[in-house]
């Protein structure tokens, strides 16, 4: 079915309109929905492509683990590189850029074979393209640590690096910053390393589910608690969790299906209980009156007894984009809109006449 949403355009997202295969299942669990998604993706991709497709069950990755290992909640599992936390390894370091910072490390197998230009280019990418303050690196050779921050790699530090998987012949990249920033930049550096070193597995579709999303997040700008992902999902632990737990520790029954670094579907076990709904929104700063006013259709429907239900919505356009090996949705849409959300072929949106407005009882009042 077509879905209309006010979203900014990008390579994997069409402005204004897209198609979803939307389904809801009564008296269903999260796992049952994931099994349906597995069947949809495996059968469709096997039928219409000749690439290798992951067999069910797909990997289930908790959101926290995804952010720690990949720096993103839609990881491309064709890329074998993993982000490691190296904060404790450098706790006694004399390197000022690492002091009092979260330090993320990426071990690149056989990376010591790369020349200085490669490391300079990666540093330039990190600083100019993704906003890093810098990108530290070192090679582990037979002669010992070489290049970059080699002089700060003590025997104790080297031992710590070996514990996270580094060995002679490898190179390492380090990002030091505040926790969330370091995590995000490390994720982008990981992706770029995979591309530049040609590490991405070819002719294969690697699927996974991201699960256990946080129900809430802290909004630093407004100093308040906000919903993290989907406000209408069921919190894990129900009312007891909402009443007794730190909101930032509450997880939700929310899940995303991911393939090759793209979000393919999003879904949740829905919150069908009006009391739970009011309490969940209260934590995010909404009064019961606001919930009734802004979400009246749901709130009022729930009063009549809605069955427990769960669902998801795979994106049809995005599935087609991957199955045709394109990297932009415009290539698989018959009449794509431009970046200003205009349909150039039809000349839409366009001005309407007074008669047309009168027919639908709309009046334009100019200020």
Task: Walk through the language-model features, giving the residues of each.
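Class II aminoacyl-tRNA synthetase catalytic cores and aaRS-like
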Residues: 1-367
